Amino acid sequence: MSTEGGFGGTSSSDAQQSLQSFWPRVMEEIRNLTVKDFRVQELPLARIKKIMKLDEDVKMISAEAPVLFAKAAQIFITELTLRAWIHTEDNKRRTLQRNDIAMAITKFDQFDFLIDIVPRDELKPPKRQEEVRQSVTPAEPVQYYFTLAQQPTAVQVQGQQQGQQTTSSTTTIQPGQIIIAQPQQGQTTPVTMQVGEGQQVQIVQAQPQGQAQQTQSGTGQTMQVMQQIITNTGEIQQIPVQLNAGQLQYIRLAQPVSGTQVVQGQIQTLATNAQQITQTEVQQGQQQFSQFTDGQQLYQIQQVTMPAGQDLAQPMFIQSANQPSDGQTPQVTGD
């Protein structure tokens, strides 16, 4: 082996001094070898023989060949270690690292065949830590079911179109809630109400032009006042209310001469307290309010005036301000 291409300089470190005297010392040991020295080797001969047999061209191995290979490998390892230790001392460290061996291989041409086996760490691109990406699936829409503190009241509205089948829909409302109903063109919608105890809901829907109300009172006809009573079982009973002649005359006088009035989409929700009345009206034209008293009850007539020239049927509802405790609502219909 040649010592050309080694480290230069006049450094007096222990590793450099050992390297300078390495080959003269090795040559002296080889000259002084005897037969006894070949019997004991620092490297295991069996492993060397196994490596030699990996070559398919090798048929037989002589007894001296493994001994020579073991001695040569020992010298090679010692020289490489000394050159790596020089790099360790230059970095002021006391521990031999893999990077030191890689630097020794790079700086010495004789060890070029080991560059691919022992690469330098700094020549490697830094390993990026792979970020663990957890695939998050979109959460499916979750349906929440909850119950309000107040027990809801079901209102069932049944509508029947002219010449079509009957369809029904159920709406749940809370106490004090207001619903606005708008009739469709050419549709007559009778309303069925189911309310709980202590709450009254009145739904009024106007009929389109050309259709008659269920109860009509024209010229020369009598007017009948119906009172709705809701029983404990939820059934609605209509009981005729007897009014005196003065009250009927007052109601007739409150009606306009020509049938040009209509109430559209009016819903009145009466709270449990008879003094609180919430009204929402969808209307056209002007409104007229008339009131009359019968003893301790106050009746209110609400009307909407439409432009002249429109012959529309007129529903009229009378609401009593003094609501009875059993949830009764007087109602008057006419045109």
UniProtKB/Swiss-Prot annotation:
GO function term, MF aspect, one: DNA-binding transcription factor activity
Annotated keywords: Activator, DNA-binding, Nucleus, Transcription, Transcription regulation
Chief location category: nucleus
Gene3D superfamilies linked to this entry: Histone, subunit A
Keyword Amino-acid biosynthesis: no
GO cellular component, one term: transcription regulator complex
Superkingdom field: Eukaryota
GO biological process: positive regulation of DNA-templated transcription; positive regulation of transcription by RNA polymerase II
The UniProt record lists the keyword Flavoprotein: no
Matches recorded under InterPro entries: Histone-fold, Histone_H2A/H2B/H3, Transcr_DNA_Rep_Reg
Cellular localisation: Nucleus
Record's function text: Component of the sequence-specific heterotrimeric transcription factor (NF-Y) which specifically recognizes a 5'-CCAAT-3' box motif found in the promoters of its target genes. NF-Y can function as both an activator and a repressor, depending on its interacting cofactors.
Family (UniProt): Belongs to the NFYC/HAP5 subunit family.
PANTHER family found in the cross-reference section: HISTONE-LIKE TRANSCRIPTION FACTOR CCAAT-RELATED, NUCLEAR TRANSCRIPTION FACTOR Y SUBUNIT GAMMA
Protein name as it appears in the record: Nuclear transcription factor Y subunit gamma
Organism, as annotated: Mus musculus (Mouse)
